Every structure is written in structure tokens, then in C-alpha cells.
């Protein structure tokens, strides 16, 4: 569902459309990370329909090309009208002929005209080797058997056997499912199109003068059974390419959107006339040679923005300079202005190094000509970061232990011993030791580990002490691990959980405290941690995210279980406690909506008063109802009796089972804070019409939400937080009330988007409630055989660098959904690779740079993951400044009126003018924190200062060769005022409001 674009986004969309109208077919939107390029694209999608020739075939086709399926899953909903999702199983290029017709048929049936298809290079364009997915081959089978030649039973069987390949399980089911898809009654047009296309392409030459059809007929004959497997391998590759070409013939995109396209820049550098059947060539020939197709490129970093001297010397290549000019050539290709761009840019580039020796006014004119030339084909809006990001460079010297040194020494000694047993291993980077605790336990796909394992088996084991390199599973089992031998990890654990004298006890939190609580409570785990934020950690090393996810989750468990369960062990099976003696599920109280009880609590009417007052008011109303009921009173509370009472109150009956003497208090807490009640009220804000649907979906989501109280860490957290009651379900109610669950869910629903259908909101909430993930971890006991234990990841998880399989993408999507929710995980660790375009900002304002990036733009890209629309720090500061307002929309509306002034509508959604009197004297302002845990006396401190210095100047050298040398040359020659004039202003909003 589309978000309404803000003023600066509308200006960019308008600029793109004007360029299209003026004959420019390729336009780049290079807005800084996090400023909503997808929202700009959605506005272009909406308006480009009006351009001449777009709707000639009654279907408006958009092809969305992005770098991975996680981004596709995130953004396709914004681009489409129907809240579409990406089906990984059908994402291959060779399947798009079917996907297009299926979607087209459904659209026309529903009188719609906009079709959005998603292609991702990691899945859609992999055809140069391999036989593809089972779904891909099943569709090939379903299509080929439409032809008369393959309707013979024996030949169909042979074709099926050839296409089955390694799909030993479930092949028949997948095959028959696609046969059913293709044979659906409303797909007549598709069958006609695909049969005609196949007859044409099957006559193409395969090899040795034979056609694809000849080879197919040969291999599906009874005589070729023995050769079918080997020869069939190469034929399937040919068939995949054939159907990919058919897909490209079928697709007639009016608009191609290439998102984060720097990740597959080969698409814009490929030779369009090349006869090579690579995926890039096929797509490029189709999309880029079609003069009728509009192409919109989206990327915050469309080319490498900066090349350091080290990179220049190491690679012998000025990558930034080449990237920049390659991009310009692509954007201006076939344009009449193309010959002029080199001259304009050369004039500017020649003058810039001589800044101090030439007339500044003349340089400004050349700069303006270059800027106008760029603006013709692109737009770039940048955020104002002043006052948003707070730099935190903690002193971690007190976190250093003897174990840090021993880790390094043990690794070097182990390597020496392995070398004595014939392994070609000499040293390990010092940064391995500084970055990862128990590094050998978490290394995967490291050549170093492979060599060490070989040496270990050969005899190095007998000579080596490795207690700092490998986890001991016995220590893990007994929750005895407390020395991690890594200063960075010790710092993060202390930052999250506190030290011995001042523990935070955040391990007891099951969700982030709401930014805008509806009522006051006494001191609790939530009030003490009201400014707690999730953490996003970026590292250069693949082992670090796994290490952090496993060990920080372990540490949270260790702290919980040591206090909650005497003698607990890691492998203990914690009972499901939400059950009473009669084995009736106590959770039914929490996932059943009582419309009567839900109506008794009106958050807006009681906003700002205490929980005790609200509870007392509701209790009085309930007591009046209970006094009229005929039932035995009892001092024993039972979830069964409470459930019967809820039903009686809803049905208006005067009889029920037993009534607990304190039932009114219990029912008041259910009214205020049970998951079902809170979800019901949250959903009623979205849909006030269909109360049955609202109730059904609220109960559906509540069933998932109750799960957080019904696992190892949830049970321990509730037990430690709520100690005054004996029955677990009463403790859960108290926990929900203390945690302002209603305010928490309302804030979450606001972030999901109240303009979305209720079914999508319900789905998104359920996606955010994930279970613990297992992580295989090497141990001292199992290192020889690579026998690993499984550690749970829940408080912290790792993300990214997964294969683009259906299972891996589903897992990554659920992790991202969970992190962008108030619920666990509270820390997400990743490498920088592949995370461009993804957002993690809903509940995170703390970014830890575990290792410094080599390039200033990478620093910005990382922080762009949390410096985004309505990020956590913005919401919390808005809630503090406009606390008299109740609803989030009301607060943001008021903030817009008071704070926007001459700013673009980045205020108040991206940043707040903290010099405004509303914020100036406050001491509780929250910032995005850039946390850099640097070892004392480390060269990283100097590297960081250099990065920050370059960060403020590198834009001045855009598109120039040898940038770092140019910066040195300009140092001291450019005043701040001159620098402002020489920075390129490519922002449509800024240029229009000058």
C-alpha cells in the first residue's frame, strides 16, 4: 500500500516525470539512504500512467528489479496497489511468462490495470549453469505437455523423469500443481500465447545442426533412457534460457525500476549487441534497447563515491572515477546532449584543482554547468544530520582482560603447531582476536579454520591450549560461562545489561517500553528502562554476527535463569506454564476477546492518569455486574472459571460457574492489558465497521503473541518481574499492564501503517513474533569431528549473507520483521554486505560499528539503516515534546505545524530542529547513537578521525580522479562559504524553493 509522499518526495517524483516528458528515458533518483526512494518510485508509478502510449494494451506493467529478495519483500507492497508479496518459488526469469499472464488475468477480472513484477539477480537471472529449481522445471513440464508431441503417455513420463533431476521428494506434487495452474479455465489466452512461443523457439538450433525440439524428442524416446540424465542436464539449461527469452518477449514493461542497482551494475555495462546468452545480456537487450520503456534507477550510492589512496594503490584502478562516468554514459545514451557532457565535465574538472589560483566566479560558472548537466538526468536529496547523530566513543580499557591477550597468544601458538604438522598456515589477523570471542567456535567457510582443523587432527591438539578459542560445552551447559575474553563483547554486554553494581535487568524485557505510555505505574522494569533501544551491529567479519547472536542470547539466559531457576541447565526443558491443573490452556484467557471487558477501558479518556486509578474505576463497574450473578464464591482462582465469567459477561447471563473472590481485579486487568483486548482496540482504530472480523483477527494475532510468555525466557522474565501473585496467568496479566501493552501495540500499528488493510496489519504483527533460532557452534569437545552444539538465538540474532533459497529468504524476512517490532530480538548483527535498502529503524537508535568501514560512504549507508522515517529517536522526542496529545497522528500533525517552518517535510518525520525552544532546555532528548568501541592505543582511532574528516568533504570531489590527493590539494584553500557553493545541489525540492 502506498504512503502519501511528502513535499520533497513529490518534488523528486515531479522532476522524474518532467524528464520523461522531455524525452529522457533513463533517470536516476540518488536520494540519501533512508529518505524514501521507494515512496518516490510509487508516486512515479502512480503518475507515469498519464504519459503517452503507456496504456496502449490496457495493462500498465512495471518491472521492479532489485538486488535481493529481502528488499523485494519489503518494497513491493509500497509499489503495488494490492499489497502484493513476492513469491520466491516463481521468481525465476524463465517463469515470468506464466506469472505475467496469471497476474494480468486476475487484474482484468478485478477491473485493475497496474501489474508489478519483481526480478532479483540472485534468483531471476541464474541460468548460465545448473538446472534451476523444481518449480521452474515443473512449469517447463506443464508448458511442454500442452504440445501434441508430448501428450503421448510414455513421452510424458520420460519428460517428467528428465526434469525431475534431484527433486526426489514431492516432484509429482509440484509437477501436477503446475499442470493444474496452466490448465485453469481462465488461462486460455496464456495457453495460446505460450504454445505459439514454444513452437517458434523449439525450432532454434541446439547443437550439431539439431534443434531443441530434435533433442527433446530424442531424449524422451524409450531408447535413450540411459543417456537421459547426463544429456538432459544441458538440455534443461537450454530450455531454461528458451523460456527466459519467452518471458522477455511476453513482458512489455512500461516502466522498469532498478533499485539499489549498484549491486548489479553489470546490467548497465553489458554490451547490448553481444550474442552471449548471459542473464545480464538478455535483460539488457530487452529493457535497454526498447525506446518505449521508461527506466527509473534508484540508489543512494549509484557509483563508488570515494576511492582512498590505499584502494587506489592496491587495486591499481580508480573505481570511483570509472563508475561515475560509466553511469553518466548510460544515463545519457542515445541522447542528443551526450557529446556535450564530456566537455562540460572536463571544463569543471580541469578548473577545480586550481581553486586558489583561478577566478572563483569562473569556477562557479563551470560548476553550475556541470550541476545542470547532472540534474537533467538525476536528482539527489540529502538529509540534515546536524544534531541527529550523537557520537559515542566509549573507553573500553576497563573491559580488557587477560583473556584478550591469551586469545591472541593461543591462536598464534596453535597456528605454529599446525604448521609443524604440515599445514600451510602462518598467522591470523589480529583483528580476528579483537573482533570475536571464541573465534574458532564461530568461523564458517574460513580457509584458516580448515587448515587448523587439519593440523588439529594430525596432532596439534596435544600441544595446544585453546580454552579462549573454543567454547566448552560443559561450561555452556551449566550456565558457568561469564568470561568472554573479548573487550568489545564485554563492553556491549555491559552497555546492555549493566555492571554488577548497576544491573539494568533488561533481560526481563519482552518488548521495548512504549514511547508514549498511556498511564503511569509504579517503578518497574519498564520505567527503569524507558529509554532502552534495540542495537544494530555491523562488522567486517562473517563470524562476528553469529558470535554476538549466540553469546548475547546466552548471557541474557544466564542472567535470567540464575535468578529464576535454581540449578538450571542449558538443555533443561521448561514446562509450558500457561496451563491449570485441568490441562485447560490458560492462554485462552489472553487470546479470547471479551467485547464487554474491552469496552470498559478507553485509553484516550483515561490518558495520563495512574494504572491504579484506571483499574479501580473498571473494577467498580465489573463488581456491579458480578453482584447480580448467581454463582458460588471461591477463594481459589482458576483460568476455567475466569473464562466462563468472561463468556457470561459477554452473553449477558446471570449464571456462571464459580466466582473467584477477587475476580473483579482479574477481569479489570484483562480489560486493560490482555493481549486480545489490546489487539481488539488497536484493530478497531483501523476498522470500525466489521466488528466480527476485528474480533477474529485480534484473537488470531493474540494466539501468536501469547507465545512470548510461554517459552523459556518469557516464563523466567514474568516470574522475576511479577512476584506478588502465585498463578502464572495472573503474573502475565500484571506484566502486560506494567508494560503498557496497549500503548506498545498502538505504536506498532501506527508504524505498520493505519492506511493498510486490517488483514495485512494482522499478518505483519504475527510475522514479528518469532521463536528462538538455533546456531550450530563448534566446541572444544567436538572440534576434531566438526561436531557442533546448537545454541539458541533470541535476545540477539544475526542477519544476512544467506543463500537466496525460499527457506533462507523466509527466515531473513521474519528476522527483519521481528527486529522492526517492539518484541525480541533486541540486537541484530550483520555484515554490511547486501543490507543497502533495508530498514531497521522502528525500534533501534543505537548503531555499533564493530569494525570501521574502509569508506566514508559505507559509514553513511550503515547509519542509513536506522536514520529513517519516524525512527525511534524522532518518535520518542515527539512524544516528550507533545505529550498532551494522545494519538500518534495528532502528535505528528501538531509537530508539523509547530516545527516545520521553512524546512522540507523531513521535519518532523526524519529529524527535529533541536535548537527549538521545545527541545533546547530538555535533558532527556534521545539521539541516534554512533557507537565505536575502539581498543586503547589502537590505530582505529586515527582511522576513524580520518573517516569523519573525509565525510564532510568527499562530495566536493564527486566524479574526480584521485580524490584523496585532490582533497589534500584543496586543504586550506576552500572556505566554508565556497564549499557550500561548490557542493552539487541536485535536490528538486531545494532547487524549486530557492
Identify the residue ranges that each predicted region occupies.
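ATP-binding Walker
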Residues: 35
